[in-house]
């Protein structure tokens, strides 16, 4: 009788492990906003990459909490968009294998360059405003961190042509 109950108790454990595995392996973009700061965690089959609009120590701690909450001890890459120098460089370096940040001496992405890891890619679409294309598996996201990014992408040759199957993220409140 006791052995039967022990075996039955294993069913919920196996079910929760299976559900956690399925959640961990799906493709998604987790978006967190706090005041004017944004964190975008791209997830693909257990891998992760992060984009942050802020570069200070608080932003890095928030990025760490976000990645750890979703099961990522270390991300493939991080893109920090804030050009203002802070004393949080060491924190950002511990988050990922590669950190693209002006504070760390790496210039922003240039046209034609990509941050890339298996199933995750970020590409700059135009210089002004930093409009970007984020690929998460088969998903395509157009990222517009600033108002200038939207108009810049509309006028660029690599811009938002055929964006009907793309999802869109705005890092600003559009004006009416």
Go through each PLM region and give its residues:
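Non-globular, low-confidence helical/coil segments that flank catalytic cores
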Residues: 1-176
